[in-house]
């Protein structure tokens, strides 16, 4: 059960000028170039910063009951009343004061953490496995290009 607990943002994987993946810590990521945003458009830059802040605020909660949750911070400026209404309406779920995505099953296989993304599909006509190994070679929980470290 060494995986059970809360994992917080460590770094974001981005491509450098040589098309190699490099990992940026929160401060570096927040201040890195925005190649897909018109940086002269203040509203677009503000939207991108809002998304980046949300990313660096994310957590992974691995529970002892075999469920794993991706947690996102509540949006800035949202009142408790608005949060309560959204929860009551079933629009969002809360866990540890954060918005929780759908639970994903996890299990240990040969001493390694695996979780079910729920993403099904095919690769070259073969059904792909929706289960992925969670911990990379450096010991980080990796979801897409985001690395998390256990606290």
Q: Where do the protein language model's features map onto the residues?
A:
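Tryptophan-anchored aromatic micro-motifs
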Residues: 1-36
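Contiguous, well-ordered beta-strand patches that form the walls/edges
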Residues: 12-17, 39-150
């Amino acid at each position: 059960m060494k995986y059970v607990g809360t994992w917080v943002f460590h770094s974001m994987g981005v491509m450098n000028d040589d098309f190699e993946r490099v990992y940026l810590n929160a401060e570096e990521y927040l201040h890195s170039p925005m190649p897909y945003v018109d940086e002269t458009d203040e509203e677009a830059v503000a939207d991108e910063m809002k998304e980046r802040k949300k990313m660096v605020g994310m957590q992974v909660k691995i529970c002892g009951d075999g469920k794993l949750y991706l947690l996102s911070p509540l949006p800035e400026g949202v009142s408790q009343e608005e949060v309560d209404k959204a929860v009551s309406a079933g629009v969002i779920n809360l866990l540890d004061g954060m918005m929780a995505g759908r639970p994903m099953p996890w299990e240990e296989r040969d001493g390694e953490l695996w979780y079910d993304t729920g993403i099904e599909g095919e690769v070259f006509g073969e059904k792909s496995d929706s289960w992925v190994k969670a911990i990379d070679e450096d010991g980080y929980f990796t979801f897409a290009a985001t690395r998390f470290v256990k606290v």
